[in-house]
Every structure is written in structure tokens, then in C-alpha cells.
């Protein structure tokens, strides 16, 4: 769990335990994963919906499938706070909880497909496949999952996403731009193999590489004649203006550019 997620959840928890609407002993039993005590309180009529079904959210966050089942069987609202329980379960990698929540009606596309986004962020391949199979939008956040798989070299995920309709050129070729900016040749080769538009947005990827001094990327572009001479001349200018003289010298040595200067 990242620090930011942990801090957010602690703030929420502190808000809950200070609320007059929450039975503190019930919350203690939830926090300590004491299923027997939780059932006892529920049978005594404790409000399972207190603080927007916080008990279900907390149990989902903790990957406690048994408690999640108990709470839902006692009427917990699976859609509370825009299906936040599903978001937490996906965020924490709680695959079995995710499957149970969806089986019981959770909206897989709630919170702008946050469940899929969190699964992609943690590179949880099986969860990604499951969520997409259940209708999650593969194009969420301008194909975030595809960009993330390229950035982190998760090629199994990348291949699955491409085979299921992800847009390799989404967001003006953001995946390619990231790879070129990082001088990530293996990613560039993979994107080219899957027919990415290598010249998208006026060869932005090449110009970024020249600006940053990423010689390997510049060499890949020129050796494969990906961009026209006009854009290679632009790259030459970018390199010179940003003191990337190793890139400038390389581009200057290219006969097709030299003849145009």
C-alpha cells in the first residue's frame, strides 16, 4: 500500500471512530477481524450502514472476505459511496473480495473505472483480465492501463490489452511519448511492432528524444526512416538549442539532413 493511500484511509478511520453514529465496540471488532463479535453486534441490531457502510469498506480494504460476506448478508450496501468498497479491494489487490463484490452486484465501472485503474497500477494481471471480462472500460483514463504496461515493461498485460481493443495511439500517442522520453528502446520496438503511429503529433516522440539527449531513440528513428527530413531537421534544432551536442552531431552526420542544411 502506498503512503498516500494509507494516510487517506487513516484520516477516514479517525473520522469514523469519532462519530456519534458509530458503535465503537462494533468498530473494534471490525478492525480486529473478529468475525464472531461482528456477527453478535449485527444480530443485536447495530447499524451496518453506519458512516456510509464504513464496516464494509474497511473489511474490503483489509481483504477480509469472510467479514465482507457477513456484512453483505446482513444488508450492507455494496454501492455505498459509489462502490468505494470495490475500489479499496482492487487497490489492495484483494482479488477474491473483488470477485465477490462484483458477483453481488458491484458496479465494475464505478468511480471512473477506478477498480481497473488500481489493478493496472499494481500490475495484477488476473484481476485486470477479470475486470475487463466483467465489463470494465479498457479505455479508461485515456487508456491508462496500456500506458502503464509500457512504462513498467509489463508485456503480458500489454499484449492482453492490445488483443482486447486498447488504443495504442490514445492521448496523442502518450505511450510512445513516454517511451521516447525515457530512451526506452525495448518499449519503442514493441510499440512499433504493434503498429503504433510513430510520427503522431508531428513526430513529438522524436523531438522529445532530441530535446532530452536520448541518442538511442534518435538513432532508432533515423535508422528506420520513421520521420521525414523536415522533422529530423526540427530534431536537429531541438538538440542544438538544448545543448544536446552528441545528438546534434549525430543528426548532422546524416547525409539526408546534411544535404538540406
Curated annotation (Swiss-Prot):
Disulfide bridge map: none
SUPFAM superfamilies in UniProt: Ankyrin repeat
Taxonomic superkingdom: Viruses
ANK repeat placement: 21-50, 51-80, 81-110, 112-140, 142-170, 171-203, 231-259
Short name of one Pfam family: Ank_2
Signal sequence annotation: none
Species assigned in the record: Acanthamoeba polyphaga mimivirus
Keywords: ANK repeat, Repeat
Name this polypeptide is given: Putative ankyrin repeat protein L99
Gene3D superfamilies: Ankyrin repeat-containing domain (1.25.40.20)
PROSITE patterns in UniProt: ANK_REP_REGION, ANK_REPEAT
SMART domains, per database record: ANK
